[in-house]
Amino acid sequence: MNQGVGVLGTVRDSCKIHPMVHDYRMTEAIENLSDLITDQGNGSDFFARNHITQGMDALFREGLLRLAGLSDQAAFELAQAMGGGKTHLMVALGLLAKHPGLRPTVLPADLAERLNFGPARIAAFNGRNDPEHFIWGEIATQLGRADLIRPYWIDGPRGVDEKKWLEIIGDAPTLILLDELPPYLLN
């Protein structure tokens, strides 16, 4: 191909492959929401290899301000094409909610200084799983309140009322992430 003035090269010619692409250890990184609960790292590796997009910035701003009690926006629906983008956004938000030390290094200063809460409690549900205690039992278990939800699943599934959810969640900053719900709802 002629690489004269004004002619673009191919993607292969124009880009360099990052060495991380060939690093098989990347499979050890957080790949799904449930890893947020058990991961021992602080999330810095995740953000070192990811670029913060405008969409991520908007989600971080609104979601973290809600956790700080500075926004009334309580639910966020991520409507994106398939391919992991939604899960990626939720993992990123979960890491920032869980690890306050990341916030000053990842977030704009005007946002980070407004976040007056420590580590948020996180419940992360992946609908490709099928827990015996149903989605609400799994969420309550991750929040350390399995005892309060047990009556709603032990003798067969029953809906959990708003008052019980308020008791389970309490006043502590709490982030509940739900991913891949259609497969769960089909079961």
What is the role of each PLM region?
Residues 184-187:
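Conserved ATPase-coupling elements of RecA-like P-loop NTPase cores
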Residues 94-127, 148-160:
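Flexible phosphate/Mg2+-sensing switch loops adjacent to catalytic phosphate-binding sites
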Residues 2-84:
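Walker A/P-loop-proximal flanking segment of P-loop NTPase domains
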Residues 87, 133:
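Walker A/P-loop
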Residues 68-77, 95-102, 122, 136, ...:
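Intein modules and their embedded homing endonuclease domains
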Residues 89, 93:
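Hydrophobic positions on the alpha1 helix immediately C-terminal to the Walker A/P-loop
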Residues 147-182:
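Mid-core helix/loop region of P-loop NTP-binding domains shared across ATPases and GTPases
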Residues 76-84, 119-128, 175-180:
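Extended hydrophobic secondary-structure segments that form protein cores and membrane-embedded regions
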